[in-house]
Amino acid sequence: MRCLPVFVILLLLIASASSVDAQLKTKDDVPLTSVHDNAKGTQHRRIMAGCCPRFYQCCYPG
């Protein structure tokens, strides 16, 4: 029973600690938005490359 107050205090300290990023950023880290934009651009290029010459509506998605 003596350990219970210590355990509760430790839990409170852990919960109140400010969130810290455990991993430091390096120069190779890429923001997620950049990856998302690259994926959208790749998808658009694939659609444009598969454009059917007979029906030009399929060339422009959306």
Swiss-Prot record:
Q: In which tissues is it expressed?
A: Expressed by the venom duct.
Q: Does the keyword Ligase apply?
A: no
Modification after translation is described as: Contains 2 disulfide bonds that can be either 'C1-C3, C2-C4' or 'C1-C4, C2-C3', since these disulfide connectivities have been observed for conotoxins with cysteine framework V (for examples, see AC P0DQQ7 and AC P81755).
For this UniProt record, the keywords arranged alphabetically read as follows: Amidation, Cleavage on pair of basic residues, Disulfide bond, Secreted, Signal, Toxin
Q: What is its main location?
A: secreted
Q: Which cysteines are disulphide-bonded?
A: none
Where does the record say this protein resides?
Answer: Secreted
Residue list for modification Proline amide: 61
Signal peptide (residue range):
1-22
Record GO terms (molecular function): toxin activity
Prosequence residues removed at maturation: 23-44
Q: Which InterPro entries match?
A: T-conotoxin
Q: Name one GO cellular component term.
A: extracellular region
Q: What is known of its domains?
A: The cysteine framework is V (CC-CC).
- Name the family the entry cites: Belongs to the conotoxin T superfamily.
The protein's name is: Conotoxin Sr5.6
Originating species: Conus spurius
